[in-house]
C-alpha cells in the first residue's frame, strides 16, 4: 500500500493536473505573454551557460525559483563568454560532475516538478555538442554521437540522484568513469529529463539524425522536438516521425514559434497535433519578448488563433 501511495504521488507531480490537459509554457516574459494571450503558463523555459553560477551563491537555486511554477532548464556547453566550455566526451568522463551535481541538488531543494533539458538541438551544427559542421564534416571523437549518448546518460543519472555507490554502479555497468564528486546526490523523483533534438538534422545526414543521439529509453523521461514555421513551412513530417519512433515515451514540443511571419494555420495545426496525440504533455512557445521575430504581439492573426486554439488545451 505504501508503495502504491508513493507511485500515486509521483503521478501527481509529473503529469498534467487534469486528464487530457497539456502543460503550456513560454520562453521570455511570462507576464507579458499572459497579457497578450490570456495563457497562465505552467512552464517557463530558461537557458543556461556552462558553469554559470558556480561562483555565485544562490544563482542556481534562483534558476528554479524564478522560472516556476514548472521550470524547464536548458543546459548548454557554451561558456558565458561564448566559447565551448566542455565537450560531450568531457561530460562523459565526469569533468562536468561538479556543475551538474549543483544543478541536481538545487532541483532537490526546489522540491517541485521541473524539467531538465540537456544539450537541446544536438543534431544542429550551430551547437558545439553537435557531431558535424554545417558542411557535413566530422568534428572528431570528442564530439561523436557515441560520446554524446554517454554524456546524456551521465547527466540523466546525476539529475535523478541517488547514493554515490548506486550511481557509480550504474556508471560502471555502462563502462563509464565513477563520479568525480564526493557524497550522495539527493534523489529527484519530481525531475523530468527531456531529450530534445530537431526532427531532422542540420546537416541533414543519416549519421546526424535525431536518433543517432538517442541515449536509450532508460535515460529519457520525455522526448521533445523544436518546430518553427519558417517561410510558411514547418517540418511536420519529421516531427511525426520522431513522435512515432519512441512510442513508450511522453512527448513535448520544447520550442515552437513563427519565424517572422503571421501564419494562423501553423497555430491551428499545432493545436490539432496536440489534440490528436495524447502522449503530448507540454508545448512551449518561443518567445514572448517584445520585438523578437517570434513575438505574437506583432502577429494579430496568429495571436487570435493562439487564444482560440492553444490556450484552451491547458484547461
Map each language-model feature to its residues.
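Substrate-binding cleft of secreted/luminal carbohydrate-active enzymes
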Residues: 22-27, 114, 250-315
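Hydrophobic faces of well-ordered beta-strands that scaffold small-molecule active sites
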Residues: 24-26, 42-46, 69-75, 114-118, ...
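Bacterial N-terminal signal peptides
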Residues: 7-16
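Boundary/entry segment of secreted carbohydrate-active catalytic domains
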Residues: 19-55
Amino acid at each position: 500500500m505504501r508503495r502504491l501511495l508513493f507511485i500515486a504521488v509521483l503521478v501527481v507531480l509529473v503529469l498534467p493536473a487534469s486528464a487530457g490537459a497539456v502543460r503550456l509554457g513560454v520562453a521570455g516574459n511570462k507576464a507579458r505573454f499572459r497579457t497578450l494571450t490570456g495563457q497562465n503558463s505552467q512552464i517557463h523555459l530558461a537557458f543556461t551557460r556552462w558553469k554559470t553560477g558556480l561562483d555565485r551563491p544562490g544563482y542556481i537555486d534562483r534558476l528554479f525559483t524564478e522560472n516556476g511554477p514548472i521550470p524547464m532548464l536548458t543546459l548548454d556547453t557554451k561558456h558565458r563568454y561564448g566559447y565551448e566550455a566542455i565537450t560531450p566526451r568531457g561530460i562523459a568522463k565526469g569533468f562536468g560532475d561538479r556543475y551538474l551535481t549543483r544543478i541536481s541538488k538545487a532541483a532537490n531543494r526546489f522540491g517541485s516538478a521541473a524539467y531538465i533539458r540537456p544539450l537541446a538541438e544536438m543534431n544542429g551544427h550551430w551547437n558545439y555538442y553537435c557531431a558535424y559542421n554545417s558542411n557535413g564534416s566530422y568534428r572528431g571523437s570528442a564530439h561523436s554521437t557515441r560520446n554524446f549518448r554517454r554524456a546524456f546518460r551521465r547527466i540523466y543519472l546525476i539529475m535523478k540522484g541517488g547514493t554515490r555507490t548506486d550511481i557509480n554502479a550504474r556508471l560502471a555497468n555502462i563502462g563509464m568513469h565513477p563520479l568525480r564528486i564526493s557524497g550522495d546526490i539527493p534523489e529527484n523523483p519530481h525531475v523530468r529529463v527531456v531529450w530534445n533534438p530537431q526532427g531532422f538534422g542540420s546537416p541533414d545526414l543519416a549519421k546526424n539524425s535525431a536518433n543517432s543521439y538517442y541515449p536509450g529509453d532508460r535515460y529519457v523521461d520525455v522526448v521533445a522536438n523544436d518546430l518553427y514555421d519558417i517561410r510558411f513551412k514547418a517540418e511536420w513530417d519529421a516531427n511525426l516521425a520522431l513522435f512515432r519512433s519512441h512510442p513508450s515515451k511522453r512527448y513535448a514540443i520544447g520550442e515552437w514559434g513563427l519565424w517572422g511571419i503571421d501564419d494562423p494555420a501553423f497555430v491551428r495545426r499545432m493545436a490539432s497535433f496536440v489534440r490528436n496525440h495524447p502522449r503530448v504533455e507540454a508545448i512551449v512557445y518561443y518567445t514572448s519578448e517584445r520585438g523578437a521575430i517570434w513575438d505574437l504581439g506583432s502577429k494579430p492573426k496568429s495571436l487570435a488563433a493562439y487564444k482560440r486554439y492553444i490556450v484552451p488545451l491547458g484547461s
